[in-house]
């Protein structure tokens, strides 16, 4: 029978008589008390026999019901005539009480003990505002006493932890905090930590604390702290185990000390020394990072080489002495011994008989005695003869020189001293009497070699060009070149003779550097070809201009990677144009469609109504990674209505224009001016854009704050130039050399974080240590420069050095680290160069000095390869050797395919001027020609020989 039934049944009878019984006891006690003290209170002198209220010796304790087992509540009081339990405000039935009565021998008072059982069902059926509770009520003849309330709850422990500990990887001596929230239970579970199934005693290890809200804290991690940690929760019902958390304590590698510098690897001259260090202090453990930096350092060393002495030439013999001997001497000065070198071996003085043995001391033969006058006369005759010979030779040299000048094809110099150093590298080739005429550096041993160095361009016009085309073969000795013969000492040092060029005077040949002459060729009222630049767009842009004529030239936008090459002859004779080029730095007018992105700046060249007779070359930088075929790249042009239309795909075949895609730039051959741009459509998620990442820093208004700005822009020079310009206005300084980041088109975002900030010198403002940029914002970063700002604060004004790492990484992609090590004081900061200086000077170069290949050499190359050849030695092989293997139909439509190929070569090599690559290509063609000659029939050889003679090849 349940507790409710007992309360309803037996409890009702108890309520009827228990109060009355208590009232009787109370009345009796009151009457006795009234007889002694007017009924107010018992006197203190009365013994505790029948005049004491019940005192509880044992009160009921809180209890928990485990599973279905009932619990017993007991209480004990003295003196007590009766004890009853009251649960949840209701009396417990008398039948449910079990009581015992004993006598306290020390006091002689009765001691009554009562207990009851409480079942799980009784507790579950109770629905009160508080827990199930019971208390004892004891009666004596003086009154009643109540015990404390004892709560009865059903014990349980849930299965699942509210929070399982998570595995951690921490550096050695770092802090480890493992969180554990045990399952809900009654009573609350106690937590114990296990390491590798062994209990952890925090009292025996001061480094471990398990008292903080069930968490495990290891203050300084040691290698021995690595292991599997388990949180154990237990109460009187059950035990529960959490998931194991693996803790790995790793050790980042540290460099050992540098070794001493090794000895120089060469005994003399320029060599190197090295020193090394190992990543063993400590060695990386448990997946710790390997040491950053180089394990080997090298420096150059220069040791003075010992120079052995060498004799000068012997001096002239001295005058014959009275002893019939004359002397000659030499000195050890060619060169003198230096740096411990050996002294010259041999005699420094030599003597011999000067009379062929006919000299007799004190008695000379009669025929050897000459008057003094005769000897003087012979000396005069000797010197007179030598003088006459010198004069004759000088007259002969002058006569030959004048004769050759009168017979030369060219009457005046068309290059000055400035042209000899006109900005391109020297072009060396050797001419041989026999061998392949196409080889720039023939492998055959010539019997006569003339070495020439072309140090400047040649300014030649059409009539002169025709004469040049009828000269001898391409690399035979040139009749229009005179060579200055230098001393044998210069030849021994390998210094090539400098060639001087002479040409006929021409009315349309202008001196170098006089570019202004082009603009003054026509009267001001007759200038239909000079365009006004006021019609240029007024948007934010970079712009450069130059005046060009028939000789052509090059227009360069400094530090942007954009350039324009006007070939020789592209502009008709006696015409000149003011050509401009600009880059849009505002909001791009080309709006991307779908997945298409802008890969280059919008470049405008003009004037748009200018007509050229030969395609010009426009170089536009781009930011696509073209090493893999994941892009579909298009060239687009803006129409007069402001719309963009596709000109061609880079991989398509076209005869209207030609695109050559290099890793960082696209070279386009065009015949009309306008606004052009490159767009790309990623074919797969592996398409990669090249981003340039850089960090700038500057002090803020608060003297303790320092601002870092991290930029991620397209890897084009003009995009970074815009960033540099903005930072200069804000007072920012470049803190680390920019680096390249490959950003995939996989839709994952970019994270930028600041790491390794000195903890006691600097602190970073909250919530700014790591910033995330959405993918679309980075993928279309050409709209405006993308940057994230970080604010650092110094603890004290005395801190002037800042060191930290900036990590730029794409989720599931590549990452780049910028190591900042700088002083925040501008006076102590090392300046980092923004751009190479090669574009910063001469934005407009006109005439021959703008080209790397001398014009005469260019004309002969074109004459050689434009003519079809039975052996395949034509312009197609020239294109192949210059890595031009596609869309050859474009060159076939040109009047001179070789000239267009060389124009493309000029555009690709505008910075390096690598004439060696062109020389190697021609040399390779020469070898192929030789191989074909060896396997051909004699008739074919003879025919080709006659053909070469007729065409001057």
UniProtKB/Swiss-Prot annotation:
- TSP type-1 domain mapped to chain residues: 252-306, 308-360
Q: Got any disulfides in this one, which pairs? A: 75-136, 87-134, 180-231, 264-301, 268-305, 279-291, 320-354, 324-359, 332-344
Q: Where is this region: Important for interaction with FLRT2?
A: 91-93
Ranges where the Death domain occurs: 859-936
Signal peptide (from-to): 1-32
List residues of the Ig-like C2-type domain: 153-244
PROSITE patterns per the UniProt record, alphabetical = IG_LIKE (PS50835), TSP1 (PS50092), ZU5 (PS51145)
Q: Per UniProt, what is the membrane topology? A: Single-pass type I membrane protein
Give the record's keywords alphabetically. Answer: Apoptosis, Cell membrane, Developmental protein, Disulfide bond, Glycoprotein, Immunoglobulin domain, Membrane, Receptor, Repeat, Signal, Transmembrane, Transmembrane helix
According to its UniProt record, where is this protein located?
Cell membrane
Q: Name one GO molecular function term.
A: netrin receptor activity
| Coiled-coil stretches noted in the UniProt entry, renumbered to this chain | none
| Membrane side Cytoplasmic: residue ranges | 401-953
Cellular component GO terms, alphabetically?
A: cell surface; plasma membrane
Q: How is it modified post-translationally? A: Proteolytically cleaved by caspases during apoptosis. The cleavage does not take place when the receptor is associated with netrin ligand. Its cleavage by caspases is required to induce apoptosis.
Where is the site labelled Cleavage? Answer: 416-417
Residue ranges occupied by any Ig-like domain in the UniProt entry: 54-151
Q: Which residues lie on this side of the membrane: Extracellular?
A: 33-379
Which of this chain's residues carry glycans? 117, 228, 353, 376
Q: What is its main location?
A: membrane
GO BP terms: namely:
apoptotic process; axon guidance; cell-cell adhesion via plasma-membrane adhesion molecules; pyramidal neuron differentiation; regulation of neuron migration
Name what induces it. Up-regulated by p53/TP53 in response to DNA damage.
For the ZU5 domain, which residue ranges apply? Answer: 542-682
Protein family (similarity comment): Belongs to the unc-5 family.
Protein known as? Netrin receptor UNC5D
The taxonomy runs: Eukaryota, Metazoa, Chordata, Craniata, Vertebrata
